[in-house]
Amino acid sequence: MLSIDIRSDHGDLSLQVKTRIPNAITALFGPSGCGKTTLLRAIAGLTPSRGLLTFNDEVWQDESVTVPSHRRRIGFVFQDDRLFPHLTVEQNLRYGLERAQANGVEVKLTLPDVAEHFDLQTLLRRRPTTLSGGESRRVNIARAVLGQPQLLLLDEPLTGLDSQRKAEILPYLAKITRELQIPTLYVSHINDEIAQFCDNMIVMQQGELVDQGSTAEVLPRLWRESLGADRNLTEAGSLINAWVARFDPDYSMIHLQVGNQPLQVIGPTMPETSQIRLFLAAKDVAIALQPPTDLSIRNTLVATIRSITPMQDEAPGLVAVELVIDQPTEPQALSAHITAAACDALSLEAGAQVFALIKSARISSPSLFES
């Protein structure tokens, strides 16, 4: 657990953050200049700050103590590349590993394994100046991981990587951070990255924390509260956790369970019991008062209406219906955008049980969420 209660002034920015970061992957989100990088640098001990900073039972900073950056065992991936130009890729990677070994840290991640997962085997003898931007990013992340960190700070680490590389690296990062229980702060402006990779979210504005919670709670709120600088990055919708019941190869159909309710999506073969996350766009959720029959829409979830809000400013004539999926385990929120006319015609109101018709769903890689 990382506990933060710090203040720091830098030019026009006054940073003031008080929060606790769990041992999970937490997204740090906000507009440019809001203090995300400054906060990471303060946590790492690279930027002066005042206040209290503790990690687990160790005090990193208070009125009388400031633990130097190199003794905090933090893996930091900066926005710009920080590779040593006079060393080869392999020597850069060994630098992080050897520092950990010199400090008596147990080595759980080896260079061959990390190089394989980041596809660096063919780059090991090259110098950083000969690498592309995407290759440099991969080496930077790998070196941070090989340092056997007890905390990872990733400042837009996948910048410059194409979607295929991101799809390869994100599952591995998620796997090692969860298996080794490395708390991670992850700065990104990309909605899909946050949805797939992060368990929790922190939203910052003008140096302050303005929202915090699970990704499934916070990410859908960003659109409604207009906190995103670009609404294309925060499409209205919901993140739903599900698990794979079986795969039907005849139809390329994944049969899922959302709590005790079935749901089907087209997708690749996935191992049974894999935990996955779905994105359901609010515009793709319809509402019925009775179980529908003879429809091409195959997915229906029983849910209870929590609230109905007119969208007069964003989309006149529409209402945002917030629902809770009926299930015996932890409730999951679901958003639907329907016309005000349909809402009135169905006499919808808070507390009513309805049937949510899911027109489409976007699925994330199951390997990100396997326990």
Describe the residue ranges of each PLM region.
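A short, proline-enriched helix->beta-strand linker immediately N-terminal to the Walker B motif
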Residues: 146-150
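ABC ATPase NBD coupling module
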Residues: 60-75, 99
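Conserved ABC ATPase "signature" region
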Residues: 58-62, 105-123, 174-175
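Conserved ABC ATPase signature
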Residues: 127-131, 135
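Glycine/charge-rich catalytic "coupling/switch" loops of P-loop NTPases
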Residues: 262-310, 331, 337-371
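Internal alpha/beta loop-helix hairpins
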Residues: 178, 188-261
